[in-house]
Amino acid sequence: SYHDDALARLDEGFRAVKFTPFEGTNAGYSMAHGRRVEARVSAVREAVGDEIGMAIDGHGLLSPINAMEMAKRIEPYGVLFFEEPVLPEHLDAMADIRRTARIPIATGERLFTRYPFKELLVKEAVDVIQADVGNAGGILEVYKIAAMAEAFYVTMAPHNPWSPLSTAISLHLDAVIPTFIIQEITTALAPPSALN
């Protein structure tokens, strides 16, 4: 269950959790789905308490109107951020969601080089940048993205579901980013047989 999974992460020493409470794609959205999403978020908040960070990953599954509705539903639970409520290429929709939501909006794992990040920042479409050192162009490129973000009062929570090497690289980069808030890491790596 969501509750038990959250408790397991706490037992592992994590001080924040990120999860996806959504089902399928936007085509399956209904009021009942919205209530189930809210129940999952509530269960995790109950499990981790108020001192542990909680981020919600939308995986770009929602339409703008449904993302706005979901932002309202999860707002009372004190989330760190709502990641990719819509796909990042929909900049105007992301900006609209950010203006209406009362929770931080995050994106960036699917963006490459600093140029699309610049558009996000200029359109005021994001509160938290999730540049991925492996996807966005390497250490220097992510550092440049972070410098741009700082000028817009936007924080950094780098994306990283990869290997221990990319985790180490990301952590070194985090140490020099003034607006760094949290680093994503994976809790398990695929066994070598999965790579064959």
Regions found by a protein language model. Name each.
Residues S1-T100:
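Metal-dependent enolase-superfamily TIM-barrel catalytic cores that perform enediolate-based chemistry
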Residues K72, G78-F81, E89-N196:
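Shared catalytic-loop signature of beta/alpha-barrel
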